[in-house]
Amino acid sequence: MTFTDLVIILFILALLAYAVYDQFIMPRRNGPVLLAIPLLRRSRVDGLIFVGLTAILIYNNITQHGTPITTWLLSALALMGLYLFWIRTPKIIFKPRGFFFANVWIEYQRIKEMNLSEDGVLVMQLEQRRLLIRVRNIDDLEKIYKLLVSTQ
């Protein structure tokens, strides 16, 4: 096994750890889930570039008669990228004391101001940061509003 194979294994393990944390661990942290709302994806171009470059590496490894283990590892890396960028749906998860947005825990008391833009984007102003929450279904904004009013 070469150094390249070890680096690819490291990347696969890192992506797998992130996927397990996002799917199974994060919803169980900081209390029960009150509401989980699917969000719009930001951009699939980054994922397309990642999977495309990995496909080029797979092709190059096959045509240059590289080791089969490297081909399999690159294929696993491409599948992890496919899952993370296309299959997994980003969510905002509301808990009794706060919420997870982009895998970051934010307590309700940090919210200074909330606005709704014309195009249906919920804007939350924190102390030093502005969150732009783009929900997949516009009716979910009403659920978020009712939850925030009931918990505040």
Curated annotation (Swiss-Prot):
It is a multi-pass membrane protein. It is found in: Cell inner membrane. InterPro entries: DUF986. Signal peptide: none annotated. GO terms for cellular component: plasma membrane. Pfam families: DUF986. The chain crosses the membrane at residues 6-26, 45-65, 67-87. Its main location: membrane. Keywords: Cell inner membrane, Cell membrane, Membrane, Transmembrane, Transmembrane helix. Belongs to the UPF0266 family. HAMAP family: UPF0266. This is UPF0266 membrane protein KPK_1957. It comes from Klebsiella pneumoniae (strain 342).
